[in-house]
Amino acid sequence: VCNNCESARKRNHSILTERALREIYLKVFEIAMDVNKPDSIMTAYNACNGVFTAEDEEMIQGIFREEFGFEGFVMTDWNSYDMADIVAAVQAGNCWMTPGSTDDTYVTPIIQGVKDGRIDLKRLRSNVRYILRIVQKRIRKDLGVK
């Protein structure tokens, strides 16, 4: 949301009114979710009104999930961990931190975030459930099972 330039997109910070956000940027997401029911959406690198989109719980949970009825999984843009805080992103509702990692880049901070209460275990479970639901949906579709 609010990332409409390629140059310096990891440093872009959009400041805009609620009206502009909803009428210009969010309207296309609302239509896409209503018409196409996407399996996933991706947060951008940029910040919007002071919050990195990957960390924006109000945007992910309040607008996309509650208002627009989005039921798929949310993923970060590629290598967003150098922009957004992993713990805040998971708590906001990011289900998949792309591209993933074979080291401790994600795992240790997430475990510690659960232990110290910065990540609600219910939210983490919900994030995993969103991914598994789409995996199951795709497998069933591939097998021709309803």
Model-derived segments and spans:
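Glycoside hydrolase catalytic-domain context in secreted enzymes
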Residues: 1-146
